[in-house]
Regions:
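Bacterial N-terminal signal peptides that target proteins for export
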Residues: 1-12
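N-terminal signal peptide c-region/cleavage motif recognized by signal peptidases
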Residues: 17-19
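Predominantly extracellular/luminal regions of secreted and cell-surface proteins
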Residues: 22-36
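Acidic, Ser/Thr/Pro-rich low-complexity intrinsically disordered segments
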Residues: 25, 43-121, 128-130
Length: 130
């Protein structure tokens, strides 16, 4: 009986770990157009809220994506290429995130912003190298 209980506990732990460590699988991203033309977006995030955006970039032109929040909550930023592979992340503590990516090919990139630890107003910026 103890082995069954341990097995069930282990399965539940794995399911919870996957749910926490694999962000935004169910979030439908909003297309914001071309990354070079994007200025910034102010986002109201609830506790444990998340949003996803799509931006298009040109191969070889590095971009930097950042977040900054008004309150000291824990904001995470994840970037995925068009195949769904994670190409960058900043899951450090605090409201500020920063990632740099140099696209290998032209295409859309998905940005997932997740907030933990209380509601926050977050500014999302993207700068493309000239």
């Amino acid at each position: 009986m103890k082995s069954v209980t341990r097995f069930v506990t282990a399965v539940v732990a794995v399911i919870l770990a996957v749910a926490v460590l694999c962000p935004a699988q169910d979030v439908t991203p909003k297309n914001l157009g071309k990354g070079a033309a994007f200025n910034s977006k102010r986002i109201e995030l609830k506790d444990n809220g998340e949003v996803a955006y799509l931006l298009s970039f040109t191969a070889g032109k590095e971009f930097e994506a950042t977040t900054d929040g008004l309150k000291n909550t824990d904001v995470h930023l994840f970037v995925y290429d068009s195949s769904g592979a994670q190409v960058a992340k900043d899951d450090s503590s605090g409201p500020k995130c920063s990632v740099k990516v140099t696209p290998a090919k032209d295409g859309q990139y998905k940005f997932v912003i997740k907030n933990a630890g209380g509601a926050n107003t977050v500014t999302f910026n993207v700068k493309v190298a000239k």
